[in-house]
């Protein structure tokens, strides 16, 4: 079988970009390796951000970070995003084929990038990796320890919010990318289905301390947003919703064939 790397080399006249989407802990790296795509150029802001945190002597265990560490993390993320943007622009200017490894939490930013890539002469595909909320939170919670401190764990509240946004975007991405949309599922066999129990188990133990007090108006808006998020997430945890999501997905073998066809087109 012709390798995907060979296909890319033969199609240098028309660069290809694969935008990777999925919540933290969805197993995007695992899926990439299973699809024989690991040899392609991969752009991931974490490859810049994590070394910056290490150089600044800031913990990668972001779920347990102090207020001072959270402040430094935000500073380093801003710097990493600036450098990452330059790397993406240079790759596009060089007409290199690549994989953009992100979450896809922002539909508007992703749609804008797709348009910019197409205007630059790229053919663009999305590879979307769906996972359930509990797996996303579990993988994130264990990542720092399992990597022996070499990989970062995010604040679980951020993971849950990102999961909600990227899951909500699935049908919109399917419509945006059309035939160039591929989705695979990577889920737990048994999962919790009650949002309050999930919050109690995965979020409450890591609730940030030392945060700046909110004004009554700010607290009201925050409470309303959290209530709305919980209601939406509870719907997303239902069997009916998950069955609808799975309808968009395909086997890894079919995904492999679709990607090969895309790269060879």
Region spans (language model):
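Conserved GTP-binding G-domain of TRAFAC-class P-loop NTPases and closely related GTPase folds
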Residues: 134-265
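Conserved phosphate-donor/acceptor-positioning beta-strand/loop module used by diverse small-molecule
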Residues: 118-140
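Short hydrophobic/aromatic beta-strand immediately N-terminal to the Walker A/P-loop
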Residues: 17-19
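Conserved glycine(s) of the Walker
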Residues: 27
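Proteolytic processing junctions in secreted/extracellular precursors
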Residues: 2-11, 239
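The conserved Walker
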Residues: 23-24
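Conserved substrate/cofactor phosphate-moiety recognition/catalytic segment
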Residues: 30-96, 108
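Phosphate-binding P-loop
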Residues: 11-15, 90-93
């Amino acid at each position: 079988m012709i390798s995907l790397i060979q296909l890319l080399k033969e199609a240098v006249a028309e660069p290809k970009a694969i935008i990777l989407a999925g919540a933290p802990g969805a197993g995007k790296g695992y899926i990439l390796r299973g699809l024989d795509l690991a040899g392609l150029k991969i752009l991931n802001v974490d490859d810049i951000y994590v070394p910056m945190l290490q150089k600044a002597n800031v913990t990668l265990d972001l779920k347990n970070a102090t207020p001072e560490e959270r402040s430094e993390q935000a500073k380093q993320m801003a710097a990493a995003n600036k450098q990452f943007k330059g790397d993406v622009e240079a790759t596009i200017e060089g007409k290199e084929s690549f994989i953009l490894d992100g979450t896809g939490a922002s539909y508007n930013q992703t749609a804008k990038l797709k348009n910019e890539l197409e205007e630059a002469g790229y053919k663009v595909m999305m590879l979307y990796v769906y996972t359930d909320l509990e797996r996303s939170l579990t993988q994130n919670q264990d990542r720092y320890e399992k990597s022996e401190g070499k990989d970062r764990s995010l604040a679980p509240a951020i993971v849950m919010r990102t999961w909600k946004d990227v899951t909500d975007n699935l049908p919109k991405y399917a419509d945006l990318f059309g035939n160039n949309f591929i989705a695979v599922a990577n889920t737990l066999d048994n999962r919790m289905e009650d949002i309050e129990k999930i919050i109690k188990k995965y979020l409450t133990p890591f609730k940030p301390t030392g945060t700046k007090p909110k004004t009554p108006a700010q607290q009201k808006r925050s409470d309303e947003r959290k209530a709305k998020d919980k209601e939406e997430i509870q719907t997303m945890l239902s069997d009916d919703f998950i069955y609808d999501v799975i309808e968009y997905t395909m086997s890894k073998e079919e995904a492999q064939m679709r990607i090969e066809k895309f790269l060879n087109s």
